[in-house]
Amino acid sequence: ELASQLGVSRMPIREALANLEKKGLAESVPYAGTRLVTLTKDDVRQIYIARTALEPVAAKYACEKITDEDIQNLKEIHAEYIRIVRQEELDAIDVYQQNRLYHFSIYKISQLDRICAMIESLWDNLSFFKLIYGQKLLEGRESRERMIEEHQSYLDALKQRDSERISHLLAQNLKKRTEN
């Protein structure tokens, strides 16, 4: 049915659904088809606990390997994030994508490919949740400015090559989200 609605063959649809299943975002239901997985509060909590364990490690290693060119790239990504977040009409998808680009640009510098893949999987599991609830988080001006300040604090720690500081900041901010 989906293939005919989209005007494509069944093969790309099957591949896309298999990919979603592999990432834990969808599940096959015998005699019914495929459906999206519903995350419980506990699922979200566990994902944030795992992110809190992994992301500060990747950021710490990134801080030890970061170049001036990397910092310049992050400044540009952050500037675009600020522009997007401060728009009158906020687009949750744009915010999510730019936020993801910022974080993964940091983690990629670590060269810890397996850890980065695990982090990416955790983000993928939360992507729909973050798009829905992330919009609510960014409704107020104060909340938006806090997110900008968080990103700026990471950038400042990276510029100073302060690996302990960036690790601490990320862990602290992720822990807050776990508690909420």
Show where each model-derived region lies.
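Short linear motifs at protein or domain termini
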Residues: 1-64, 114
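Hydrophobic, amphipathic alpha-helical faces that serve as interaction scaffolds
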Residues: 50-66, 100-140
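Secondary-structure edge/capping motif, primarily at the C-terminal ends of alpha-helices
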Residues: 61-62, 81-89, 133, 158
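Amphipathic alpha-helical segments enriched in hydrophobic/aromatic residues interleaved with Lys/Arg
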Residues: 72-88, 94
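Inward-facing hydrophobic residues that define packing positions of alpha-helical scaffold repeats
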Residues: 78, 119, 170-171
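C-terminal all-alpha effector/ligand-binding and dimerization domain
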Residues: 131-180
